[in-house]
Regions:
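Feature primarily recognizes SF3-like P-loop helicase cores of small DNA viruses
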Residues: 1, 7, 11-23, 52-478
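Trp- and S/T/G-rich repeat-edge/linker motifs of beta-rich repeat architectures
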Residues: 27, 32-45
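Structured alpha/beta reader/binder surfaces that contact nucleic acids or chromatin modification marks
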Residues: 44, 49, 404
Length: 478
């Protein structure tokens, strides 16, 4: 009986789809496919039963009509509807996997149609394209955004290079490509426009934009490696992900950021759900007053960091409290501004070139300063060592000095001995001796000698003489 009902339901439901991975029905609302969170599908079941009930009046045989009416009444119970809805999930043409939705990364679904981003061609909404998201803006090729352009001029301080960088960055975020393999930090003290910038773009992009907690990309010991990452799973299909500002002193989860920006398939799962794979198409953007700590010094993480400075503080008397509403009225023009940026990005990345973002001295300088500030080994070596031709320092002595220096400077994160040695080798040659390894042409500075002796109860017994090899300076009993 349930199978017969589900087949009858299939005729009504042929315009609906079932997602077996997320265990939800997908319904077409005339512009996009949406999760059936309002139980529309059960309403369709009631409509089908109403039609069957009406059909009874056209049946001449009383017994047949009575049997059908009794069958309809039984089917109205919640248990019966759940049963034939479950059967309908498997009917031909109804099941559809998540990866079958939103497959064309070069389209942007808008309120007045589907926009081909490369050609700027608008076509009517089409259920056969299986698009599940929609930006909250109309495409109007003649629309302009003078207030927005003045705002960009203000927040960049008239830096034309930085203004163009922002335009191309936003244009790149419209499409589903992650070719740049990077994340963006909008950095600066308050009252500089970065929040207004992101909020305006979030309004424009609608479903294509999602907000994530700062913990999503923060490294934390409390998170187990096998924990359900529903915070990552929910980002599937988004193109623009804004991150809440993290706590001061938070550490970036470098491995996860590499995964999320690398363009490769990642695995996630909703809590209590099955694991699934997806290829990210979102770009991560965080507006912050304080940057996260980055322990890694490898190219793999730093080539992914884009630090966009927002350094123009807007005095309170010049702040326009109506600016958000004015910018919202210009969303069609802002879309055209972003599309111009996308055209520049596409032109710059032709011929297989990975990077389409333009050169920007302000961004490059900010990243360089950030990297230098985060290189704690370089800071330790600058504090505690100095070049000294002919002198050496035992590797174990230098590592002990480093640990003491970390304690002195409240450095919560400390490198293991092996990793520490690999980092120091980038600055000094290491030589293997008969009894121990030693760094060549290095001497401990006065600060280094002080740190070396910390916790021993005594001061160094030998002054840091520059004329003798350092292994003689530092030969102290462990």
């Amino acid at each position: 009986r349930d199978l017969r009902m589900s087949r009858g339901l299939g005729d009504v439901y042929k315009r609906q789809r079932y997602n077996p991975t997320d265990k939800c029905w997908m319904v077409w609302d005339g512009a996009r496919w949406k999760r059936d969170d309002l139980a529309t599908i059960k309403g369709l079941a009631d409509e089908m039963l109403d039609q069957m009930d009406k059909a009874c009046f056209g049946i001449r045989d009383i017994n047949t009509a009575g049997a059908l009416r009794r069958h309809v009444q039984k089917s109205r119970s919640s248990r019966s509807k759940e049963a034939f809805l479950k059967e309908a999930q498997h009917l031909p043409g109804i099941p559809m996997l998540p990866e079958q939705f939103d497959r064309n990364k070069g389209l942007l679904n808008l309120r007045n149609g589907i926009l081909n981003l490369a050609r700027r061609e608008l076509v009517p909404h089409d259920r056969a394209r299986y698009i599940t998201r929609m930006a909250q803006v109309d495409y109007d090729p003649a629309a302009q955004a003078p207030v927005w352009e003045a705002f960009i001029q203000s927040v960049t301080g008239g830096d034309a290079q930085l203004a163009e960088y922002l335009q191309v960055m936003v244009g790149y975020c419209l499409c589903g490509s992650t070719r740049e393999q990077c994340m963006f930090f909008l950095y600066g003290d308050g009252a500089n426009g970065k929040s207004t910038f992101l909020e305006t773009l979030a309004k424009m992009l609608g479903d294509y934009c999602m907000n994530a907690q700062a913990d999503t990309i923060a490294s934390t010991r409390s998170r187990s490696s096998g924990a359900a990452r529903s915070d990552v799973a929910r980002l599937k299909g988004a193109r623009f992900v804004t991150l809440e500002e993290g706590d001061q002193g938070a550490t970036l989860d470098e491995g996860l950021v590499k995964q999320m920006t690398g363009g490769n398939t990642i695995t996630a799962r909703f809590q209590y759900g099955k694991e699934f794979e997806f290829r990210p198409e979102f770009k991560l953007v965080e507006a912050t007053n304080h940057l996260p700590k980055i322990h890694g010094t490898d190219v793999g993480i730093w080539r992914r960091i884009r630090l966009v400075p927002f350094t123009q503080s807007i005095p309170e008397e010049k702040q326009d409290i109506l600016l958000p509403q004015k910018l919202e009225a210009e969303l069609p023009g802002i879309l055209n501004w972003a599309l111009d940026g996308l055209q520049k990005w596409l032109a710059n990345s032709q011929g297989g070139r990975r990077h389409g973002l333009p050169a920007c001295a302000a961004v490059d300088s900010a990243v360089s300063a950030y990297k230098q500030d985060q290189d704690r080994i370089a800071a330790f070596l600058a504090d505690c060592t100095e070049p000294a031709e002919g002198s050496t320092v035992q590797a174990s002595v230098l590592f002990r000095t480093y640990l003491n220096w970390c304690s002195e400077n409240n450095e919560k994160w400390r490198m293991a001995n092996k990793q520490f040695g690999m980092e120091v080798k980038k600055h000094y040659e290491i030589r293997k001796g008969m009894y121990y390894n030693e760094y060549v042409d290095m001497a401990l500075s006065d600060e280094g000698m002080r740190c070396m002796a910390l916790g021993r109860g005594t001061e160094p017994s030998v002054a840091p003489a520059r004329s003798r090899p350092l292994y003689e300076q530092t030969r102290l009993k462990n």
